[in-house]
């Protein structure tokens, strides 16, 4: 596959296609480094405040356990910020555009829809903001969970350290999630490519979107942007949506 310098309106989106294509992050054992200033003991430490980590934290806290939750990024993880919520909000906007486009089939006159990308982004980020309080630091602290918004590292099999805190726990859950697999395609890193972490904040809607990966996420984005008026090309080395 050859690559060329992208035009201002041509974008590449990289999507993981299988679980095996995704890379766990943030929990590799390492040296503790400088001494933290706060020492904690807990029944349970959870690394990662995405769907899995928050569910575990809420359940454990409700059972009366002393829970410490580490998260270096956004509360809510991929699902709230870069996955389920924004993708479904984008799909809902795209469905409205397609409904208007097909109104003539039902005897209803309508002009071809135009897309206000800034308004679409506002709809997407409004959906995130509506759900965010459920996953917020304040809510979990209200449940009795100690939330530490720092990068977590293993000091030993029972101890987690961050910039300010050292926590020893009976049990540790690694719920660090994943990130999009970036395939080793020559020239790809010379392109301003997109992933699920950046596609919902693009300054402009692309005229042409090339999606690498025909899994569920890739095909969701393909349908949404095609319905919103972009030209879309999907590249998949196996079968679209798997076998």
Model-derived regions: residue spans:
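Residue-level marker of alpha-helix boundaries and capping positions
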Residues: 47, 126-127, 212, 243
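Conserved acidic residues
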Residues: 50, 151-153, 215
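Rossmann-like NAD(P)H-binding beta-loop-alpha module
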Residues: 203-240
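N-terminal Rossmann-like FAD-binding beta1-loop-alpha1 element of flavoenzymes
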Residues: 42-69, 211, 218-227
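Glycine-rich flavin
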Residues: 2-6, 10, 14-42, 58-65, ...
């Amino acid at each position: 596959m050859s690559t060329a310098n992208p035009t201002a309106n041509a974008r590449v989106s990289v999507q993981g296609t299988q679980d095996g294509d995704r890379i766990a992050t943030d929990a590799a054992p390492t040296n503790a480094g400088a001494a933290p200033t706060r020492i904690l003991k807990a029944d349970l430490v959870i690394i990662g405040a995405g769907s899995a980590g928050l569910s575990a934290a809420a359940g454990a806290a409700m059972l009366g356990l002393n829970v410490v939750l580490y998260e270096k990024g956004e509360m809510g993880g991929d699902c709230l910020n870069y996955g389920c919520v924004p993708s479904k909000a984008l799909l809902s906007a795209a469905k409205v555009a397609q409904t208007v486009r097909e109104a003539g089939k039902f005897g209803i006159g309508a002009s071809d829809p135009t897309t206000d990308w800034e308004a679409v982004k506002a709809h997407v980020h409004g959906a995130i903001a509506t759900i965010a309080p459920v996953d917020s630091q304040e809510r979990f602290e209200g449940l009795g969970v100690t939330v530490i918004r720092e990068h977590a590292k293993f000091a030993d099999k029972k101890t987690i350290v961050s910039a300010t805190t050292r926590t020893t726990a009976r049990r540790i859950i690694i719920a660090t999630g994943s990130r999009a697999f970036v395939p080793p395609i020559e020239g790809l890193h010379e392109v301003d490519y997109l992933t699920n972490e950046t596609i919902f904040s693009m300054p402009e809607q692309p005229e042409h979107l090339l999606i690498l990966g025909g899994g569920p996420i890739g095909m969701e984005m393909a349908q949404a942007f095609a319905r919103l008026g972009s030209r879309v090309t999907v590249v998949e080395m196996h079968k679209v949506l798997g076998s």
